A protein has these predicted regions:
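Aromatic, loop-rich ligand-recognition surfaces of beta-strand-rich domains
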Residues: 1-40
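Beta-strand-enriched, solvent-exposed domains that form extended recognition/catalytic surfaces
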Residues: 39-208
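Short, intrinsically disordered, charge-balanced linker/junction segments flanking boundaries
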Residues: 24, 434-440
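Residues that flank catalytic or metal-binding motifs in active/ligand-binding sites
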Residues: 8-10, 22-27, 130, 174, ...
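A mature extracytoplasmic/lumenal domain signature
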Residues: 16-18, 30, 138, 182, ...
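Signal that preferentially marks extracellular ectodomain short beta-strand elements
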Residues: 2-4, 165, 319
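Catalytic cores of extracellular degradative/oxidative enzymes
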Residues: 218-221, 228-435
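Long, contiguous juxta-domain segments that are non-catalytic but functionally important
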Residues: 200-223
Length: 440
């Protein structure tokens, strides 16, 4: 943000000093004029509604005042006043949206891949060409926008929102997400109330563990949903899965399932040493989405992907315990967190420090990786556990993961230094010169 606004600008020069992989691609730049003051229509609405979200009618508002509103708002006012606004629709159309951190900023600071910025689902989807009215309450000076995300995409068409009445024309289809990213320590990082009224988009819903709490609520929401994907919002994870797969494997229960995924993330935090950072400063979610192709599992910035048929490996919930199927998801989550130890040749093994820890936490006595006899044989024959200058594809991931895990067993399990890994990760984050081995 600028210290003072600039007036009468005729030219804008964009200077980019750094870029990932020395590559820059500017797809689009948009400019917006910030609204100042209330319009006459908004002043009229405030004579009937308690605020510009038009989500509650003033007790003193008269029928004469209501009838004087534009027809669209008469219907909203009457449904609110008479208590006939459909409860299910209202649950998603009128919501308070929390502030979230900016994931890209924290990815760099924490030596991690970026988490998602799709932390605020609306449960409402739109089609290309739809006209929307979006009514926004006080934003406390924050930048708020709406984004339409198609299926499992990471980004989509974005629409800036001002306080008050916003009239939008949809350029594409997708599920709507509120984009509200700011510094969490700011005194202005407060929830923002938004109303997307009746006939603006279609409600399909989503499950929020903090709000909805029970399997009974989940079952009802899933049955009513109509969109291709159904989103489950946990405390640490977002699961954006094909609705048909949820109906197949988890038709009546989700609380234990999403709680397990939350555990997978939280357990990995125990190794990373983020207690002073999360969630006070950094509160974005890990996004796990099913992908409509024949891929298996992978991890990248903003998302962990599961091929649609790969879901069969770790659903229903029982598989996460009984068949050690938690390894795949935990391995991919580990890819997000391995940056500080992902040395060349170890990209597919250093993350298994985290997945082995997940196995330990769910009560498995045996870790994955080559047995100690193989490690001892390497030492006997003077062979290193990893050749950092060699071809990563020819390296032995089974040996690599054993080395990382043996350090945990020695320092943590044997009680030699129970904070070894958290302290190591903190030092690697705080002094990048300690970690000068190429990543790959």
């Amino acid at each position: 943000a600028m210290d003072r606004p600039l007036a009468k600008i005729t030219k804008l020069k964009v200077v980019i000093n750094t870029a990932k992989d020395d590559y820059v691609n500017c797809e689009e730049i948009e400019f917006y004029e910030m609204k100042s003051g209330l319009s006459e229509q908004e002043k009229q609405l405030l004579s009937v509604f308690t605020d510009l979200t038009c989500s509650e009618v003033r007790p003193e508002a008269t029928m004469q005042q209501i009838q004087a509103l534009p027809g669209y708002f008469i219907n909203i006012a009457m449904q609110l006043k008479n208590g006939t606004y459909d409860t299910w629709e209202k649950k998603f159309r009128i919501q308070e949206y929390k502030p979230y951190s900016t994931p890209n900023n924290w990815a760099d600071k924490l030596y991690m891949k970026s988490y998602t910025d799709l932390d605020n689902p609306t449960g409402i989807y739109v089609n290309s060409g739809d006209e929307l009215i979006v009514m926004v309450g006080e934003t406390y000076g924050n930048t708020i926008s709406l984004q339409a995300i198609r299926s499992s995409n990471l980004s989509g068409d974005k629409y800036m929102l001002n306080e008050g009445i916003n009239k939008l024309q949809m350029k594409g289809d997708g599920m709507l997400f509120v984009m509200y990213n700011t510094e969490l320590t700011s005194e202005n990082a407060k929830p923002v109330k938004i109303h997307i009224p009746l006939t603006s988009g279609t409600v399909s819903g989503y499950f929020d563990l903090e709000r909805d709490k029970t399997d009974a609520v989940y079952t009802e929401l899933l049955q009513k949903a109509t969109y291709e994907y159904f989103l489950i919002k946990g405390n640490e994870m977002l699961l954006n899965f094909h609705r048909t797969k949820l109906l197949q494997w988890q038709p009546n229960s989700i609380v234990e399932y999403i709680t397990m995924f939350d555990h997978f993330v939280n357990w990995q935090y125990e190794l990373l040493g983020l207690e002073d950072i999360r969630p006070a400063l950094f509160n974005n979610h890990v996004n796990g989405s099913s992908i409509n192709d024949d891929s298996y599992m992978w991890a990248g910035n903003g998302q962990i992907g599961f091929g649609i048929n790969a879901l069969d490996e770790f659903m229903p919930t029982e598989k996460l315990y009984t068949e050690r199927r938690c390894w795949g998801p935990a391995h991919e989550i580990g890819h997000l967190h391995q940056g500080a130890i992902a040395w060349t040749g170890c990209f597919e093994s250093s993350n298994n420090l985290f997945s082995n820890y997940v196995l330990y936490k769910i009560g498995r006595e045996c870790s994955n990786g080559a047995p100690l006899s193989v490690l001892a044989d390497r030492k006997l024959n003077n062979r290193p556990f990893c050749n950092f200058l060699g071809d990563p594809k020819k390296e032995d991931t089974e040996i690599h993961m054993r080395i990382y895990w043996q350090l945990w067993l020695y320092f943590h399990r044997c009680g030699i230094k129970s904070d070894f890994y958290p302290e190591l990760f903190k030092k690697l984050r705080n002094n990048r010169n300690l970690n000068n081995i190429p990543v790959g």
